[in-house]
């Protein structure tokens, strides 16, 4: 068993780490990734440089920690579709999933903006982590589409190609959600519009 002092020390360490991360997020948002130095992070967090290095060994390590928090939250927003009898209509479920994903990303607007708009100039380790996330997301979309075909919910198609097209659309829709004036109603409209476009296309419905 751990004693009270150990628990308090652990809590204090977690609080200090969170303090550094929250301060770093504001600095990255204001200066961008490459415009930020360790000195900027130390000053913003209000800690000694030695204290900073007890938690993170570089600016990159801080950004990767922030990135991981964002990716975990985004993955948590993406749920599977319920195909049981009595479940909500497929379209409504997909809209809810996309809306939750966009809302989560927009809720971390500063970090999401850096990741998606500065991705090509970020450090290699950061780029690799973003690519891993993109690869996992593409695989999830493709797998979901395959399941949809197998269950008769979707027509036969190339799920890998469709996944690339859907992910590209998600990224561009996400860009729209990063505007400071984007509201929950805007996100809902974007989610519904994108789902309608991908599931139903632009042609009028075929009538018998």
Which sequence ranges carry the predicted segments?
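Basic, helix-initiating cap at the start of DNA-binding domains
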Residues: 1-31, 36-47, 61
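A secondary-structure capping/hinge motif
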Residues: 60-62, 179
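Hydrophobic alpha-helical connector segments
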Residues: 65, 79-110, 162-166, 188-191
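Amphipathic alpha-helical packing segments from all-alpha helical-bundle domains
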Residues: 72-79, 104, 124-150, 160-164, ...
